[in-house]
């Protein structure tokens, strides 16, 4: 088990050795608390865009379903006639320059897997740059936009925001509720009281402190041909290789099991880079991966490689609340 996997396991299941990391946790908290205090005091170089900025972020390390929810938000806003742009750090991307406008025909190594997925699915203008303020300014210089969505960036306080949404995995929760490196939290748990909404991925109903949303499998899409099939294409009991290089691979594997398939699971690091050799398994079976992984594998995909497309389905209460916020933020 890789070190990151062992840490995740300890954060969410407990381990006595984590107490040794608490002095480092105290130092980490001092730094993040200081950054937020400067932001609240209006100190430092803080950029406020001329259009509303909505941050869709995490307080924990690991995947929470951000990309599908952002895609839902894009589509929902576009149906209301809003021109939407997205900014992202572009984790793992190596563009020729920064900020960098992501195009659908670029490689994942150039654009980053999640930004490329968002552009290929939605067609929205998207700029990557670790400096999100600079990304927003470049995006607004290139396109007339009504709204900016920030893919993550909850802790990027140089960018002023009008709305903060935090996603939490309903099954894993906040782990041991401690900050890095003694726990999975990027900021102290008290930070959640200051955000505008919590969304629980996988919750079956809204909670007192937040809204529910689920990820619904919508189709199987062949990496090589683009052929689209319903999820019933594979019968119940179908054995297949399952590949996931995301923040929480087990959630993807659980989804496949929920479709009554029999996955042979292969978990990779988040944002992993793939090769034919890395994805050649025995016995020979169809291979199903996440859409985020698929954007990195199309160039060398075999005929029986598929990805499972999923759509975010937020609760009616969240949709109503979000519409109210859009109305409030409208000029």
UniProtKB/Swiss-Prot annotation:
Swiss-Prot/TrEMBL keywords: ATP-binding, Kinase, Lipid A biosynthesis, Lipid biosynthesis, Lipid metabolism, Nucleotide-binding, Transferase
EC numbers, comma separated: 2.7.1.130
Reaction(s) the record says it catalyses: a lipid A disaccharide + ATP = a lipid IVA + ADP + H(+)
Pfam family, one: LpxK
Keyword Oxidoreductase found: no
Molecular functions per Gene Ontology: ATP binding; tetraacyldisaccharide 4'-kinase activity
Residues the entry annotates as binding ATP: 60-67
SUPFAM superfamilies recorded: P-loop containing nucleoside triphosphate hydrolases (SSF52540)
InterPro entries in UniProt: LpxK (IPR003758), P-loop_NTPase (IPR027417)
Superkingdom of this protein's organism: Bacteria
A GO cellular component entry from the record: plasma membrane
Gene Ontology terms describing biological process: lipid A biosynthetic process; lipopolysaccharide core region biosynthetic process
Top-rank EC class of the record's enzyme: transferase
Pathway field: Glycolipid biosynthesis; lipid IV(A) biosynthesis; lipid IV(A) from (3R)-3-hydroxytetradecanoyl-[acyl-carrier-protein] and UDP-N-acetyl-alpha-D-glucosamine: step 6/6
Function text: Transfers the gamma-phosphate of ATP to the 4'-position of a tetraacyldisaccharide 1-phosphate intermediate (termed DS-1-P) to form tetraacyldisaccharide 1,4'-bis-phosphate (lipid IVA).
Assigned protein family: Belongs to the LpxK family.
Name of the featured protein: Tetraacyldisaccharide 4'-kinase
Name of the coding gene: lpxK
